[in-house]
Amino acid sequence: MAQALAQPPLVVTTVVPDPPPPPPPPHPKPYALRYMADLLGRIGIMDTDKDGNISPQSPRSPRSPRNNILMGKYELGKLLGHGTFAKVYLAQNIKSGDKVAIKVIDKEKIMKSGLVAHIKREISILRRVRHPYIVHLFEVMATKSKIYFVMEYVGGGELFNTVAKGRLPEETARRYFQQLISSVSFCHGRGVYHRDLKPENLLLDNKGNLKVSDFGLSAVAEQLRQDGLCHTFCGTPAYIAPEVLTRKGYDAAKADVWSCGVILFVLMAGHIPFYDKNIMVMYKKIYKGEFRCPRWFSSDLVRLLTRLLDTNPDTRITIPEIMKNRWFKKGFKHVKFYIEDDKLCREDEDEEEEASSSGRSSTVSESDAEFDVKRMGIGSMPRPSSLNAFDIISFSSGFDLSGLFEEEGGEGTRFVSGAPVSKIISKLEEIAKIVSFTVRKKEWSLRLEGCREGAKGPLTIAAEIFELTPSLVVVEVKKKGGDREEYEEFCNKELRPELEKLIHEEVVVEEALYLPSDTE
């Protein structure tokens, strides 16, 4: 019997299958993909086509040092913001190193939308309103496809972002409101009405001062109809005055005051006074003036807000009345400023008080770079600028071309004198002293500034002296700021009677400006 062979034990191997791969992430919804593509495109990482497909972006000009320079003057930096027709970039002035904000406007878009006149009006308005609490327009440049607004860079962001964190202390809110009213008063005095005042259009600089921006919806006095009213429905719903909602004519200055009242309420309360999810219900509240002040509002503040948010524009408080209000006046300081060499210069009252206490004269302001005629001999002074042919032609009454280059509304006069330059300057200083004007001197130009703060700012007069011949000079006097009537009164009562003594009696202007031809 054959012996059975021993069999090895049976080994059973269990094969465990690999786990299934995880399902792919869900494809983004069309609107989400579109948002992501737009975001990546804006920050310079991806390109997008018309269908929203994204692809790695090729090197772009802003990253190229050569193409990052605008007009040879500014180096473009990061994108600060964008709208339908424009983008705003941080930039740096290559020469001075100063930061600026450059608003880049697409010409094709504004032409298709019929906004060319709108852009021209905004430029005109920004030239009119030169004030420490208003964002300053430095210059406007253009290419075939773009328009560039070179503006003051305000690094503190929107006031809206500050308020979004919570209501402000009363003293802080008061200071912002004072600065707002100061700037709005100046605008109204210059015939400019903002019509879209809101915290989003109020910026803060690095020193915590307010700057009014975005004059895109502004109106100027020349736009008003024969009834003197605006008829355009515009603005942001929560800040619109009730009379604007009626779609009838309204006084733009009074509508701005209403918006200032809403802003003050927002600063103090942390929310708008007429809020409702339903915009039509909100409009009804605005029209009826239905709002409630929080319990922490002082009685003086409540009285002021009641006047500001008066639904009747005829009885609503005015800017001059606001400036006399007890709550408003607390700690208020009139901002003093002047424009020199196209640069806005500000004077703080505290600095003036220190200067007065140190023995300096408050009538004549000087610096190391300025020329003091009384201390320097006339022989050591540089000669005044000589007039070129274009200057001489433009000085002639029949060929006055200054209107092509100067800001609208600049009144002026000129005369020829044979008196020594030192005598002319001394006479202008003497006139300024009589009426307590401040005098600023720089070479052969003087600036006389009144101390009274009018609706259009202090009266400012510039006088420049030009050499016509070795023995004759032309003295040109112009109003640079302030009220026209005040300027005419000053000229008729003070300036002309005194300067007539210096006019060269034997030479009339046209004869002095006579140019012989080459054939004579």
Curated annotation (Swiss-Prot):
The modification Phosphoserine is found at residue 218. Pfam families: NAF, Pkinase. Residues 55-66, 356-366 have a biased composition (Low complexity). One of its GO terms (biological process) is signal transduction. The keyword Ribosomal protein does not apply. It is an enzyme of class 2 (transferase). Residues 382-406 form the NAF domain. CIPK serine-threonine protein kinases interact with CBL proteins. Binding of a CBL protein to the regulatory NAF domain of CIPK protein lead to the activation of the kinase in a calcium-dependent manner. This is CBL-interacting serine/threonine-protein kinase 18. It comes from Arabidopsis thaliana (Mouse-ear cress). The lineage of its organism: Eukaryota, Viridiplantae, Streptophyta, Embryophyta, Tracheophyta.
